[in-house]
């Protein structure tokens, strides 16, 4: 009997970031349209990131954005990718995302991470040097608040005394917890304390290959042999008639986004040897993003699935300044011309 083909899921990463001076009310309506279209086209998940004080970009707040999506959609999973957990207190976060899980009827994926921008830590009055401790303590408290009637514990800057989460989560025991991580120690931490690590879009494929081995060893050490049931990779994807057109079409938008990443200091938390997002566009995209025709992009995804055991592929297709029609055209092409080829080819 032939082995069953692995299941593969496809998600959409919508950063919800736009240039200064853009028509933000109009863009918000377009993002809601993109979410509804993603569900109609059969995408499995819609992911929204989180940053604060995002000059030179506008960025919609993650919690309010996902809350709105609970009403705009009915089936697609809603991924918080990621909550900057050290900036917050556990009761606040537990209650916010319990509400989202309840309002969506159990469609939340709770993604967390440390963050890397000094402006955010300073704005929230949090010392960056204690971020790892805060992440772990906050996550422990949130899990307990989601699963216990009363919680008594202390953490950095907060104290719970018979505290509870005012709204119950729908998923049992709680929504999936994913950790976004760039550096090797953070990946090892994800293996230890999260349900899954979701692979960032910034690193070259050779770096990703090495870090997946780091993750596997850390899972083994944590008593969790093998990859998680849902192993998610994020990649920037641009599909067009051919690779040259995709390369040209995406250039002004990806350049603007990665220039902002570089200025924000995203590079500083990436591994040595692959920690410069200020490269020229031609060098930046090489062996990092997926560009090409539907056939070419399908082949690239199939290769990543087969090499790394990925079974949930989240695609970044919306970048600051990109016209709405360009985003929806690409979504349509992915759903109609890429997803079937990938499912047939794996």
Model regions: which residues?
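Flexible, glycine-rich active-site loops centered on histidine and acidic residues
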Residues: 5-26, 86-157, 197-209, 213
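Conserved, mostly hydrophobic/aromatic
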Residues: 38, 42, 69, 100, ...
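An alpha-helical appendage that flanks or caps ligand/catalytic pockets
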Residues: 2-6, 12, 130-165, 204-311, ...
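Acidic (Asp/Glu)-rich catalytic clusters
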Residues: 2-5, 39-40, 66-74, 97-108, ...
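Hydrophobic faces of well-ordered beta-strands that scaffold small-molecule active sites
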Residues: 10-14, 46-48, 78-80, 108-112, ...
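N-terminal beta1-alpha1-beta2 module of alpha/beta enzyme domains
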Residues: 1-77, 172-175
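Glycine-rich, proline-tolerant flexible connector loops at the mouths of alpha/beta enzymes
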Residues: 45-69, 84, 201-205, 316-327
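Alpha-helix-loop-beta-strand connector modules within alpha/beta enzyme cores
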Residues: 59-80, 134-138, 331-346
């Amino acid at each position: 009997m032939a082995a069953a083909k692995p299941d593969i899921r496809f998600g959409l990463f919508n950063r919800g970031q736009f240039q200064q001076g853009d028509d933000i009310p109009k863009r918000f309506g377009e993002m809601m349209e993109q979410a509804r279209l993603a569900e109609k086209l059969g995408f499995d998940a819609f992911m929204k990131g989180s940053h604060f004080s995002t000059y030179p970009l506008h960025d919609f707040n993650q919690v309010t954005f996902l809350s709105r999506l609970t009403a705009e959609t009915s089936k697609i999973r809603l991924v918080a990718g990621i909550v900057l957990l050290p900036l917050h207190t556990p009761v606040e976060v537990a209650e916010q995302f319990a509400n989202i899980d309840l309002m969506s009827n159990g469609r939340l994926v709770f993604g967390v991470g440390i963050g890397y921008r000094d402006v955010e830590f300073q704005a929230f009055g949090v010392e960056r040097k204690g971020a790892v401790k805060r992440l772990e303590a906050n996550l422990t408290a949130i899990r307990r608040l989601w699963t216990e009637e009363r919680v008594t514990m202390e953490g950095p800057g907060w104290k719970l005394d018979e505290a509870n989460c005012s709204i119950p989560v729908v998923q049992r025991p709680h929504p999936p917890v994913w950790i976004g991580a760039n550096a090797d120690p953070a990946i090892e931490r994800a293996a230890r304390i999260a349900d899954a690590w979701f692979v960032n879009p910034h690193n070259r494929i050779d770096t990703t290959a090495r870090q997946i081995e780091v993750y596997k060893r850390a899972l083994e050490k944590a008593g969790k042999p093998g990859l998680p049931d849902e192993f998610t990779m994020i990649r920037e994807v641009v599909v067009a008639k051919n690779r040259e057109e995709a390369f040209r079409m995406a250039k002004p938008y990806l350049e603007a986004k990665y220039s902002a990443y570089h200025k924000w200091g995203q590079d500083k938390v990436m591994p040595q040897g692959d920690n410069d997002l200020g490269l020229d566009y031609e060098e930046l995209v090489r062996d990092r993003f997926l560009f090409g025709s539907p056939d070419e992009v399908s082949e690239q995804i199939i290769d990543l699935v087969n090499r790394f055991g990925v079974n949930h592929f989240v695609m970044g297709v919306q970048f600051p300044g990109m016209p709405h029609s360009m985003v929806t055209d690409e979504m349509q092409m992915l759903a109609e011309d890429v997803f079937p080829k990938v499912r047939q080819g794996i």
